[in-house]
């Protein structure tokens, strides 16, 4: 098939861009011709909460893309329509996670030839920023699609409450292979400058209010009572002020047991943080699905996750990870239990589940349902 994929790609950074790259590489590896249409302007600076939207390092194996789409400029949308019609595409795939994209995506899907199948991969129903009229913008986007694909049952359920048409395909979050595989633990600790005698639990990714970092920090004193040599790694760029977290750490007198790497981690270093850790902690208050869970499975590190929709779909308590009910006390109990347990069975189950979460299976499921 001739397939056009529209979304953020290099030089844009982050999980959506990384996922789009793996999507295209997998389609190409399965014999499809793929053209990539990238954003020239994605977020206006005033709406972007982070330090930069762009990668600081050059991708070694970069896919060619046409940087055309400007979310604020309808003339760029017309250029995209002309480009796609000229490519004689069989299928368009757009990737959606925020209502800001709805007008341009709807326009493109509406005015591209009716012979082209339009599919949307939906990461979030409502963006993390919870902007006004987001549900209406989602409906607009969905009206332009022949089929939509979700990465979790949770997202499918949310869409069905808003939009009654039954043209959805519920799939899964494919595991990200581009970041490599699990590395030797001692080697990883040395490379990151960590003490090889200590054990580490990891909080990884963008720091936002809903991600529950405060609960994790509050759980640390009880964790340290049982596991005095454990260290908490807080690794990721903040999208909110870090002041309250530093104040809480000082108040609890646990600064010697916490290491904060407050920056966006380059792709080639991600595997070392996961490979250094005994557990990955995901104490979110809400989740569509979690790219961090997918990373943890890729690197075969057990997770301790909130028992909420979007996370518990992939995690079975004491089988493929650990679940807790979002209190600092219960989180401490669960982490202490996990640290004392023989986690070989958990890891073996993760390895088994990994085989079902491949890009090839993801793509095959989409194409057989269109």
Regions found by a protein language model. Give the residues of each.
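Glycosyltransferase donor-sugar binding loop
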Residues: 39-43, 204, 231-245, 263
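Carbohydrate-associated surface elements
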Residues: 154, 174
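A short helix/loop element that forms part of the nucleotide-sugar donor recognition site in Leloir-type
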Residues: 180-194
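Conserved donor-binding/catalytic core segment of Leloir-type glycosyltransferases
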Residues: 195-211, 217-220, 233
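Nucleotide-activated donor-binding/catalytic signature segment of Leloir-type glycosyltransferases, i.e.
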Residues: 243-271
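Acidic donor-binding loop of glycosyltransferase active sites
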Residues: 272-288, 301
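Conserved acidic donor-binding segment of nucleotide-sugar-dependent glycosyltransferases
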Residues: 317-318, 322-328, 335-342
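A charged, aromatic-enriched C-terminal amphipathic alpha-helix characteristic of glycosyltransferases
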Residues: 344-370
